[in-house]
Amino acid sequence: MSNSGSLASLTNDFERFKRELPRDFPSHVRDTYRINLAARYLGRPLPHPIGKGSGQLSLNSGQLETDAEAGLAFAVLKTVIAQDAAGDQSMAAWAIHESKMKVERRGAGWTVTWKGRGWDRSFDEYLALVRTGWDLTRDGQLLTVPSVKYHLPRLEEPFRDAEYVFTTDALAKAWGESPLLLEKDFSPTLAGDQLSDEKAQILRWLREVPQRIRAHADVRLSMKLMNARFDDDFQHEMMEAASGADALVVFNRLFDATAGVAYGGQELSDRNLRVLDRPSARRPIGPSLSGTGNIHSGRMIVDYALRGCSSVQLHTFFQLPLEEYPATGGSRTQRALHALIFDPRDGLLAVMLEREAAGTLARRGGELHFLDLIGGN
């Protein structure tokens, strides 16, 4: 099929799938457009690059099952706060109930703000959610990844290893297969906390946390890096310090110290892409990257891919008012995927075909490959 023919088919599919997006849309895309959307996160193959970041949209089995049915590639579970065998949590200040999330416009885009932090239910309930996630992962329906906030000491203090031992071991047993896939969260509220006032303290965490987690289980580890309250150069120092991880999620939301809330929108993507644009952020070896921040279109997915990200994590775009999605049927996850993939102007397929026409993305074996975008700008 010619490039112009593909664009015509894309317009037809965009209209046709407004009512219902087929769950196995990556196969349809490959058959119809000869475009391979395969992506990767934490070394695991994905049918396409779009996943859901940790938060209020991944804290119960119903949400995970809806996402699996929609064809989402992966979901990171709500962040649990580590504890020791007695149930003590050094980071207990983060295990508080979330207030209602507020979805609002910010500039030309959208953001979600709320005052709340991590998992506020029992640890046993979290382990049950991990087991549900493992069932979906094992059956190939939805890759799920638990998320943890472990103890982070001040510079002169030791790590509370008892929390690392108990929490990691319990998660590994609930996961049921080696290696345990795990995301370590460095949250926006942490960035706004006094704990994060010192650069040396942050860099120590990033250097030492991976080995402390892996000391207690076979773990494939991703670290979700915060946007620290320092300059772009320090974001690069953080990436370098975190090189012991298997993957990095770049970068968590910004923190408004005055309002006491985290936020996203264009300010977030502008900073993230600017930091990732630097040559020092693109190393041929080291942790793989997963992009996050203001991802509201396939074009933005490509922007992150061109800067080295082999997958992306969204949160806000799955929460828009229903009338903001072009689709008229399906769950919010389905409607979001429909827009991100099939929008004939800014969807992922349209942008890949656009780059093919411009000579900046070539076919291999007759196909365009999403992963060929990585680091390609």
Language-model-detected regions and their locations in the chain:
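Catalytic cores of alpha/beta
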Residues: 61-66, 230-242, 281-285, 295-311
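Glycine-rich beta-to-alpha transition loops that act as phosphate-gripper elements at the mouths
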Residues: 54-57, 149-151, 225-230, 286-300
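Metal-dependent enolase-superfamily TIM-barrel catalytic cores that perform enediolate-based chemistry
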Residues: 159-220, 226-227
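Alpha-helix-loop-beta-strand connector modules within alpha/beta enzyme cores
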Residues: 100-106, 119-141, 198-221, 261-288, ...
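Glycine/Thr-rich beta-alpha phosphate-binding loop at enzyme active sites
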Residues: 24-33, 182-202, 233-285, 321-331
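Conserved, mostly hydrophobic/aromatic
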Residues: 52, 75, 248, 279, ...
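N-terminal capping/small domains of soluble enzymes
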Residues: 1-169
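Alpha/beta catalytic cores of nucleotide-metabolism and tRNA/nucleoside-modifying enzymes
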Residues: 1-30, 101, 120-121, 267, ...
